[in-house]
């Protein structure tokens, strides 16, 4: 039960984390868990339970039946209504059990009170500063009175252009009020650095999921769901390239293809099933998601977090897309020396599926970068990086 603000007036928690933890998105919820886990190794931290106004529209079962687009959207969800409601319930249970949530739930009406209870607010990671992201709103730029330290950790702006035409002077003012700024992608760091006229150094740091090792995630993983060997296909959006790549690998390895429900409309589910892909629609919690990676014989993905968890669980994998210039994927694969795992669908027949990945070297590189990022994060929290 949420406590009233009045009962907390004299309480301060050291660090509050503000991120997309309430979305029905595996990467979003797990990066929130990973960043909380990392910070909690040295400090007291809780996730600020902020719910943007748009969330009921974005993640509710149905949208208002007031436009033709909404009607079409709702009709595609009706056949999956039980599965969608179950998935939302499983996500909420995961948050309640695995995330240390603030005792107050915030929204646009009381967001200005967030600063009353923390010495440091960490914003990020995920696409909290991507102005095109449907989840994004100005609260993630901390536009309220706050006497403590403002830190951003590996916020992603994705392909947003921070320009005079798109952004206001007020937004620049809010960004410059941060004591420490870091972005997930190098080009994003450069864009933001230019936008704030080089008034502060903008760092490029790892996604929080990569700050934790396989052992850290062990406590989250459920009992094995699929008993047979399988290829795991994971994309946030159903992709023809992903489907065809998974089918090809399935035929080569003589294994079925499984995926977990992310597309919550019947049209995309039918498209997957028509291609012989087995869609898990019941066991769809973030812990179940990790389960599919841990026990997969092979992973096919074009998702950033699909790639991240393939690396974390040391799985053979391939990133398949119509293009091979997604900076988020390129950055992480170059870091661990696996850029050759990012291919176009047209190249898959020439790809050596049996070539093993040297995870000893991969882990050395990943852990070295993670240690560096964690040290920078701790210094930012403590106030040693003000440039």
Where are these regions (language model features)?
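Active-site anion-handling motifs in enzyme catalytic cores
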Residues: 3-387
């Amino acid at each position: 039960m949420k406590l009233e603000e009045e009962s907390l007036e004299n309480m301060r928690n050291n660090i509050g984390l503000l991120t997309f933890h309430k979305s029905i998105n595996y990467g979003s919820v797990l990066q929130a868990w990973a960043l909380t886990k990392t910070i909690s190794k040295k400090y007291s931290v809780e996730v600020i339970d902020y719910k943007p106004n748009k969330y009921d529209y974005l993640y509710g079962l149905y949208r208002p039946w007031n436009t033709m687009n909404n009607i079409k959207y709702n009709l595609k969800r009706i056949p999956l209504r039980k599965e969608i409601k179950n998935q939302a319930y499983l996500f909420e249970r995961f948050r309640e059990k695995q995330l240390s949530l603030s005792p107050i739930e915030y929204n646009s009406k009381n967001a200005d009170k967030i600063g009353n209870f923390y010495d440091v607010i960490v914003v990020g990671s995920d696409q909290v500063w991507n102005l095109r992201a449907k989840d994004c709103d100005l609260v993630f730029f901390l536009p309220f009175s706050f006497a403590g330290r403002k830190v951003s950790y590996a916020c992603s702006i994705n392909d947003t252009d921070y320009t005079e035409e798109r952004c206001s002077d007020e937004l620049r003012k809010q960004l410059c009020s941060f004591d420490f700024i870091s972005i997930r992608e190098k080009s994003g760091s450069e864009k933001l650095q230019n936008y704030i006229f080089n008034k502060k150094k903008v760092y490029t740091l790892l996604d929080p999921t990569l700050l934790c090792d396989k052992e850290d995630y062990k406590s989250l993983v459920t009992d094995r769901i699929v008993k047979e060997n399988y290829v795991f296909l994971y994309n946030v959006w159903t992709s023809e390239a992903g489907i065809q790549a998974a089918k090809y690998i399935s035929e080569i390895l003589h294994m079925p293809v499984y995926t977990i429900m992310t597309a919550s409309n019947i049209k995309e589910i039918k498209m997957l099933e028509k291609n012989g892909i087995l869609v898990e629609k019941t066991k769809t919690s973030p812990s179940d998601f990790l389960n599919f990676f841990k026990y997969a014989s092979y992973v096919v993905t074009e998702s950033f977090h699909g790639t991240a968890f393939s690396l974390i669980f040391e799985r053979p994998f391939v990133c398949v897309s119509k293009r091979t210039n997604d900076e988020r994927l390129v950055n992480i694969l170059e870091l661990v020396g696996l850029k050759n795992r990012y291919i176009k669908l047209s190249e898959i027949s020439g790809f050596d599926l049996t070539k093993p990945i040297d995870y000893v070297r991969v882990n050395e590189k990943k852990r070295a970068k993670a240690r560096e990022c964690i040290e920078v994060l701790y210094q930012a929290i403590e106030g040693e990086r003000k440039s």
